[in-house]
Design a protein with these regions (language model features):
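Class I S-adenosyl-L-methionine
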Residues: 1-268, 300
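Conserved S-adenosyl-L-methionine
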Residues: 45, 78, 251-326
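Low-complexity, compositionally biased segments
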Residues: 77-79, 89, 121, 256, ...
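Cysteine-dependent PTP/DSP-like catalytic domain, specifically the C-terminal lobe
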Residues: 107, 294-361
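Short non-domain terminal segments
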Residues: 120, 147, 188, 215, ...
């Protein structure tokens, strides 16, 4: 399917964001909550890396110059795949690795720490990648700690920060202001004229010993800049929420954060391990165009049903069972991993609701 998209001039080089949640090398077989096989996650490390390399190279080609890719993995393969992505996307285009809390604390672990996290590798195709900085809202505890002062007369909550910054400068910011020089090895953050203007507006606080500090107001803050540890996006089956029944369904709000951060309304989003369709739903709700791909017949059925009927209340048990290799369904890793293989002539069959189904031949 990715080869098919590469041959589509309207798509190739025009995808603005890729999010994928590929198999994790767990050695297990994953079932839907009605015990149908979702996918078989069994492979050798070498086979898995060849599988991923082929797809990552195709995804790199499909991305626009302003595009980004997020790859969701666990500790089994995240560092192996990072080496692949450094090679394909370039080390300079590595933007970060997000650590996500995936489930509640465990008290039944083996002789190790409880495994409650997984990881998201974040790369861009170039330095011009789209980036809408995300912010969390202030909570009362953080507000009281970070903005402890109330301005007389206005009641505006604020904090007080130095008027200087590290490093020496030539010119006005390195010279005196009101008879004071900046501390050794530092410079004024603003010119003397700008500091006078701020002082006239009441934006400078003078301490009892005559030390000036700049007021930073809470009502001018966009929020708390998001860091690379995410604690609020547990998997759906670890929350009191609705789900599709797909065993590795991800958190809708997490996908919305990623999509809002690295794309704009009208942009094209791709998920080629679409699974439960969460990426597609998030993209639809945020006004993005989207393409979803999955090799699993059950995944396609779940996605179609989700768009028609939504999700269902949690309650049924979703299992992951390790089984012998006796499945009638084909494993993801039974495919040919040859880099040079061209699957652009895949046989297409029509689907029921604005979908195209592709069959490997």
């Amino acid at each position: 399917v990715l080869n098919y998209l590469i041959n589509d001039k309207k798509v190739c080089g025009n995808i603005d964001l890729v999010y994928i949640d590929p198999p994790y090398n767990t050695g297990g077989a994953f079932e839907t909550r009605d015990f149908k096989l979702a996918y078989d996650d069994k492979y050798t490390t070498d086979g898995y890396l060849r599988f991923m390399r082929v797809r990552l190279k195709l995804l790199h080609t499909l991305l626009s110059e302003k595009g980004s890719i997020y790859v969701h993995l666990d500790s089994n393969m995240v560092f192996h795949v990072k080496i692949l992505m450094d090679d394909i996307f370039g080390e300079k285009n590595f933007r970060g690795m997000i650590t996500r809390k995936k489930c509640k604390s465990k008290n039944f672990t083996r002789k190790t720490y409880g495994n409650i996290s997984d990881y998201i590798l974040f790369y861009s195709k170039s330095d011009s990648a789209k980036w809408n900085r995300p912010y969390d809202q202030w909570d009362d505890e953080k507000v009281l700690k970070e903005y402890p002062f109330i301005e007389e007369g206005t009641g505006r909550r604020h904090k007080r920060v130095p008027c200087h910054a590290p490093g020496t400068r030539n010119g006005a910011t390195g010279g005196p202001w009101r008879g004071m020089m900046p501390p050794e090895g530092k410079h004024w953050q603003y010119t003397p004229e700008k500091l006078d203007e701020m002082d006239a507006k009441g934006e400078i606080y003078w301490s009892s010993n005559g030390n000036p500090r700049r007021k930073v107001y809470l009502d001018q803050s966009k929020g708390v800049p998001v860091q690379d540890i995410w604690l609020d996006y547990l998997d759906v089956n670890n929350q009191n929420s609705c789900l599709t029944g797909y065993p590795t369904e991800k958190n809708l709000d997490m996908l919305k954060r990623i999509i809002e951060t690295s794309s704009n309304p009208g942009d094209l989003v791709l998920d080629c391990f679409a699974g439960s369709g969460t990426t597609l739903v998030a993209a639809e709700e945020l006004g993005r165009q989207w393409i979803g791909v999955d090799i699993g017949e059950e995944a396609i059925k779940i996605i179609q049903d989700r768009f028609v009927n939504g999700t269902k209340p949690i309650g049924d048990y979703v299992s992951r069972r390790k089984k012998k290799n006796d499945f009638a369904s084909q494993s993801l890793f039974d495919l040919d991993f040859d880099d040079e293989k061209d699957t652009s002539n895949s046989q297409k069959t029509a689907s029921k609701v604005q979908y195209q189904m592709f069959e490997e031949i």
